[in-house]
């Protein structure tokens, strides 16, 4: 953790990261890429690329790649988030809502729905991409790389599936605050790491999980 915080904050201090990055909102990494403030955007969808979809020259000029290998030369599994539907308990017509969800999650329907979004989000069912050549069409190298990484490649779920406390810790932006403490408050990476880990530990302690 100390090495990671040191690496990230040093890159900022040496001018490799836009000064405004400490105050970015959710879409500002995309905006910075399009404004040519950064050359790499680590994004979970194809939103950055698809913003250039109707500008063929810009679309073709960008490159989508998977994660690099780790220090031992082994592939790094990709963190994969899953979005789901929910039906509020107070819904006026829950049975109709359930019927709609059952309809949407059919592989052929889900596939067409996601294709209408130009593949910005990945199918949760691998057979969708295996049975429809559109998903792996080499004519669109962005989508091909994205699907290969997120559907056909090695993935692991976000930590929230193991303990709900991770959602609270993530919402608190603990690691971002640790980086900001080093950059703005001259805190050492070691002190920042210790504080972040303690805060995460305090949050997770509120969600004990009994081992079976």
Tell where the protein language model's regions lie, with residue ranges.
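Glycine-centered hinge/linker elements that transmit conformational signals in sensory
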Residues: 1-22, 67
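Regular secondary-structure segments
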Residues: 9, 172-184
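Short helix-initiation/N-cap motifs at beta->coil->alpha
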Residues: 20-34
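Alpha-to-beta junction loops
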Residues: 34-44
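C-terminal lobe and pocket-closing loops
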Residues: 46-58, 71-177, 211
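A structural supersecondary motif
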Residues: 62-71
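Short, charged, surface-exposed loops that flank catalytic or proteolytic processing sites
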Residues: 181-196
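Short, low-complexity disordered leader/linker segments with a strong preference
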Residues: 198-212
